[in-house]
From Swiss-Prot:
It is a peripheral membrane protein. It is found in: Cell inner membrane. This is sn-glycerol-3-phosphate import ATP-binding protein UgpC. The keyword Cell inner membrane applies. One of its GO terms (molecular function) is ATP binding. SUPFAM superfamilies: MOP-like, P-loop containing nucleoside triphosphate hydrolases.
């Protein structure tokens, strides 16, 4: 096992536009870190630079306190698991897992010991003589992980390994990955566009946006205290409600359009007249009544999800989603009265997108 360190790493293809803005990252020995973000945010490019498949434009990469920035991938002590499995179709499972050890000159006994140990961990022992075409998608992905495990790397790199699996199998493989990490405790850097994978697998999450690490932190911290509008809108399903408005001239209210005025938890005279965006997660919106000061919402759509329901409407022309318990099924066109507890507010500067404290 080893630590992984990125020091002011950047990437530019034309010398003008930085695809990856300077990023610093310390992944502790045995830590599982997930990079998440939309397509084109730079997460896979950053992973490929750690692997040595892409050159850094500037900055340095260290694995186990050794500078590896200019080393070839084979010399970095890493093993990579890809989205498309990358198995040799003419080889059986054993030979696919053993191949990298054979070309590195390992003896037959050591190869068999390593392959069989990985196969036992991944429950592949009965499948060692099968060809990839005889395996399910989940079994193929386990073989790909087994091929990485036998290398006994300092760092595991995962590039969207579950993207090709169906929804049910993804859930199963997420659990298997968690159990695998708990057993091996190998330092891991994992890339995904799926926030559920990020939140369930990671000890720390890096939220990427346009080549910038918008926020790095524990999944619970990122969910509860998003550092920017982007993080607030990207993490969470359904997404956080975000309402543009402004602080009143006396610094005591947040006004959404002309009809909704929310009293701030405490006066903010320094924010007078400032354009802000208020965020509240759908599950934090509470049912209220007209008499208790609730805000009316006319229901335009209702999504019945089984365990709960999502009520949709608009305030001042801006979308509202409220998560209701399954027994609340308001009719389309009816009015709900809602309360936004100030303890669940997230305020952001509408111009910079940064969190306001």
């Amino acid at each position: 096992m080893a630590c992984l360190k990125l020091q002011a790493v950047t990437k530019s293809y034309d010398g003008k536009t930085q695809i990856i803005q300077p990023i610093d990252l310390d992944v502790a020995d045995g830590e599982f870190v997930v990079m998440v973000g939309p397509s084109g945010c730079g997460k896979s490019t950053l992973l490929r630079m750690v692997a040595g498949l892409e050159r850094t434009t500037s900055g340095d990469i260290y694995i186990d306190n050794q500078r590896v920035t200019d080393l070839e991938p084979k010399d970095r002590g890493i093993a990579m698991v890809f989205q498309n499995y990358a198995l040799y179709p003419h080889m059986n499972v054993f030979d696919n897992m053993a191949y990298s050890l054979k070309i590195r000159g390992f003896g037959k006994t050591q190869i068999r010991e390593r392959v069989e140990e990985a196969a036992r961990i991944l429950e592949l022992m009965p499948l060692l003589q099968r060809k990839p075409r005889e395996l399910s998608g989940g079994q193929r992905q386990r073989v790909a992980m087994g091929r990485a495990i036998v290398r006994e790397p300092a760092v595991f790199l995962f590039d969207e390994p579950l993207s090709n699996l169906d929804a049910k199998l993804r859930v199963q493989m997420r659990l298997e990955l968690q159990q695998l990490h708990q057993r091996l405790k190998t330092t891991s850097l994992y890339v995904t566009h799926d926030q559920v994978e990020a939140m369930t697998l990671a000890q720390r999450v890096i939220v990427m946006n346009k080549g910038i690490a918008e926020q790095i932190g524990a999944p619970s911290d990122i969910y509860r205290r998003p550092a920017s509008l982007f993080v607030a809108s990207f993490i969470g399903s359904p997404a956080m409600n975000l309402w543009a408005g402004r602080i009143s001239d006396d610094g005591c209210r947040f006004d959404i359009g002309e009809d909704i005025a929310l009293v701030l938890p405490e006066p903010k005279p320094q924010w007078r007249g400032k354009a802000l965006t208020l965020g509240v997660r759908p599950e934090h919106i509470q049912l209220a009544t007209r008499e208790t000061g609730g805000i009316p919402l006319q229901i335009s759509t209702l999504e019945l999800l089984g365990a709960d329901n999502l009520a949709h409407g608009k305030w001042g022309g801006q979308n509202v989603i409220a998560r209701l318990s399954y027994e609340h099924c308001p009719a389309i066109g009816s009015t709900l009265w809602l309360h936004l507890p100030t303890s669940s507010w997230h305020l952001f500067d509408s111009q910079s997108g940064l969190r306001m404290e």
